Amino acid sequence: MARIAGVDLPKKKRVEYALTCKNGIGLKSSREILEAVGISFDKRVHELSEDEVSSIAKKIQQSYLVEGDLRKKVQMDIKSLMDLGNYRGIRHRKGLPVRGQTTKNNARTRKGKKKTVGSK
């Protein structure tokens, strides 16, 4: 099993799809990586040599934010929005939808369970 940047890639999958198991790498970027390194898309993970695995890992490390670094960057971006106090930051702080969705009837996932306001 090939291990790249702390993630074990599935053995039997094609390399272009196996790379998408890493957080931060989609199908398009995995194809870009394989083109840059010069590996065929049709190769399976168990067919890769150690040199090919190391070249893929080197390319990912040079060009992409993946796994923990990506998560940390996203959290820092959200925190900076909250510190600025702009509209998106306030919505994040209150736990409401950020991208313009209506909250009169829906947004239960984001708002949590219903709270009854008054009773007779």
Curated annotation (Swiss-Prot):
InterPro entries: Rbsml_uS13_C, Ribosomal_uS13, Ribosomal_uS13-like_H2TH, Ribosomal_uS13_bac-type, Ribosomal_uS13_CS. Residues 107-120 have a biased composition (Basic residues). Gene3D superfamilies: 1.10.8.50, 30s ribosomal protein s13, domain 2. It comes from the Bacteria. Residues 92-120 are annotated as: Disordered. The keyword DNA repair does not apply. GO terms for cellular component: cytosol; small ribosomal subunit. The keyword Thylakoid does not apply. GO terms for biological process: translation. Keywords: Ribonucleoprotein, Ribosomal protein, RNA-binding, rRNA-binding, tRNA-binding. PROSITE patterns: RIBOSOMAL_S13_1, RIBOSOMAL_S13_2. Part of the 30S ribosomal subunit. Forms a loose heterodimer with protein S19. Forms two bridges to the 50S subunit in the 70S ribosome. HAMAP family: Ribosomal_uS13. Located at the top of the head of the 30S subunit, it contacts several helices of the 16S rRNA. In the 70S ribosome it contacts the 23S rRNA (bridge B1a) and protein L5 of the 50S subunit (bridge B1b), connecting the 2 subunits; these bridges are implicated in subunit movement. Contacts the tRNAs in the A and P-sites. Belongs to the universal ribosomal protein uS13 family. This is Small ribosomal subunit protein uS13. The lineage of its organism: Bacteria, Pseudomonadati, Campylobacterota, Epsilonproteobacteria, Campylobacterales.
